[in-house]
Amino acid sequence: MLVPRRVKWRKSHAPKRKGFAKGGTRINFGEYGIQAIEHGYVTNRQIESARIAITRHVKRGGKVWINIFPDRPLTKKPAETRQGSGKGSPESWVANVKPGRVMFELNFPNEKTAIEALTRAAHKLPMKCKIVSREAGDF
């Protein structure tokens, strides 16, 4: 699982869900990628689940790049607890993803297999995504 090694503060403010991605909107390493269409938080478990979906479908011969990292703690209060008495304890780590962000990249010689692998990974993510390629743009 992806988690930060060290953080300056145990809890943080909730990230804003507005605006568009400033960087990371183009494919840098691979030939194909998954691009976010809407805002959302992606947890470390969802990132790992999408990575496994890609690697199991392409088996060998492909390379996967993960361009997002869960650097924000998500806090939650215990069940059946009254409101008040401070913020809840950190439960998981999330990456704040804005529209236009390329989250995963894949380099694989067969286009049909690469698109199918990325489609399977996109189903694991909590927001609407589209598959993009380096030359053609989106599919």
From Swiss-Prot:
CDD domains: Ribosomal_L16_L10e
Sample GO molecular function, one term: tRNA binding
Keyword match rRNA-binding: yes
GO CC field: cytosolic large ribosomal subunit
Keyword Membrane: no
GO terms (BP aspect): translation
This protein's UniProt keywords: Ribonucleoprotein, Ribosomal protein, RNA-binding, rRNA-binding, tRNA-binding
InterPro entries listed in its UniProt record: Ribosomal_uL16 (IPR047873), Ribosomal_uL16_bact-type (IPR000114), Ribosomal_uL16_CS (IPR020798), Ribosomal_uL16_dom (IPR016180), Ribosomal_uL16_sf (IPR036920)
Region Disordered, annotated ranges: 74-94
Domain of life: Bacteria
Subunit organization: Part of the 50S ribosomal subunit.
NCBIfam families xrefs: rplP_bact
Family in the record: Belongs to the universal ribosomal protein uL16 family.
Function: Binds 23S rRNA and is also seen to make contacts with the A and possibly P site tRNAs.
Protein name per its UniProtKB record: Large ribosomal subunit protein uL16
Organism: Saccharopolyspora erythraea (strain ATCC 11635 / DSM 40517 / JCM 4748 / NBRC 13426 / NCIMB 8594 / NRRL 2338)
Gene transcribed to yield this protein: rplP
